[in-house]
Amino acid sequence: MLRELRIGDMVAKLPIIQGGMGVGVSLSRLAGAVAKEGGVGVISTAQIGFEEPEFEKDQAKANLIAIKKHIKKAKELACGHGMVGVNIMVALKHYKEHVLAAVEAGADVIISGAGLPMELPELVDEKSHTRIAPIVSSKRAANLILKMWAHRYNRTADFIVIEGPKAGGHLGFSNEQLADMEHMDYDSEIKEIISCTKTYEEKFKKHIPVIVAGGVFTHEDVMHCMELGADGVQVASRFVATEECDASDAYKHAYLNANESDVQIIQSPVGMPGRDVRNGFIRGLEKKKQPITKCYNCLEKCNPATVPYCITKALIAAVKGDMQNGLVFCGANVGRINRMTTVHELMSELVGA
């Protein structure tokens, strides 16, 4: 039986974090269902307000309304079990506002990547209920963040998420590293990152749980991560093919129908490589740049005149089921997903129940 996951004074019965997926793939329904099973359900705040009536006119306002709404709803669905958190990308233009809204709404955890969350401790009071974690992909990034947090804020991470090269969405690796992924000894890197956290555990006299993500697919994968020294795992792609996932049926079927050969790496307007399902949208991009008629002000660094497509428009189209105009991010193992399931069944499978 897997041990429970402790983060601060909170306990998740199952050491499974459902990874945040945006836009609109992991919202309150999915996160609440995962938490209810005793795991950690994570809502993506990326353009989370896309269904709010204010969105077309004021995206920033709509997103803040939706952050609070979805955290509240997920907690209600969880019925006091597990934890409900948010994933907030550092690359977002309104990063600070998203963090403050999540804290105000009572998010149990904030997980932050797609950049280095150097200022996160400044935004989340250590005495608040909310616990914080950076996403890292290398020992170098882990040490850089933990060293900065210790020096500037006299504080360390409440937990850390290590995201490996098989993860979906935005990736903390170069295109060259991803192309040679099969020859990468990432287990050694995981051990190095865990070793790095021990230094800060000693300094701050607290345990820093380590969560491993990227390519975790089976119970055997979960156990392998635990054997490496992890306290838990983060799984994202497999939760797309659940009844509770917030995405459209067409989005889910894009996963079910994908083969290994359909998975590719593209350059995202975020400025990082991203893993996605090759579809009509991607094939169209290879022929010509998509015209951008409106900027949704989602990213801190994005020039509509130079990026090949609008990531907001593409991700919203996908989650609503428009696959010809939609970008479908996925993990490296999406080709192995071949049937629909439920959150309960998937969680039971992952923990070997």
PLM-predicted stretches and their roles:
Residues I17, A167-I211, F217-A353:
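Conserved active-site-proximal phosphate/metal-binding subdomains
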Residues V25, V216-F217:
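Residue-level detector of alpha-helix initiation sites
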Residues M1-K203:
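Active-site entrance/lid segments in N-terminal catalytic domains of soluble metabolic enzymes
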